[in-house]
Amino acid sequence: MQQWKENLHFVKNIPHISCYCLTLEPHSQLYKTIQQKQLSLPDDDHIIEQIEVLKDFAHQHQFIHYEISNFCKENFHSRHNSAYWQRKPYLGIGCSAHSFDINSRQWNICNINSYIEFLDEINTHGDYQNFENRLFEREILTPAMQVNEYIMTSLRTIYGCHLDYIAHEFSPAFAEQLAKKISLLQQDNYIFSHGILRLTEKGMLFADAIAAELFFDENDYLTTNE
């Protein structure tokens, strides 16, 4: 833990800090090292202790905890990532880049050589439509998928999940159902609400699980719109 405190002390004067739990990717060198028991991952209790140390550090040095894994000095929030969390459309340009236009998401192919070849062909022939399906893939987002993504991302931020926004953008019935779903989470002190759902300090430790509890499926959407 002392090493962690020293790491935080080193970055105390920068305006923005992102701290994410490490995701162990299969086939990576670290994965192999851990599989061979040359290193071990910290247990949950140790991770929670690190998080508490991080929060204390952030408060002491006037960082705003504006997203579960992100801290900033005033006016230094990440504009790039905030677009994801606030459901704003964005355009990705380049190999493997992702784009989002509210109703769909698309991602460009990841092979750089193929990407360049397709662009050359488009520039030569001037017919983008013939290459569209080869250059990127697209996923159409259903209303249930859209509201679930909003719940998942907004709950991670200090701005919270607004029931009025859900009622206006998706369906009043969605907002009514969501208000009913949170009662047990409120009793267990995971979430609080006055028309805006926000995670408590305790709830932040279980953000993904809580969001999943609040998700809607396609049948929910059909039922609310009958």
Where are these regions (language model features)?
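Long, highly charged amphipathic alpha-helices
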Residues: 53, 177-180, 209, 213
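Minor-groove-contacting beta-hairpin "wing" of winged helix-turn-helix DNA-binding domains
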Residues: 196-200
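Short, amphipathic alpha-helical interaction segments positioned at domain boundaries
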Residues: 202-226
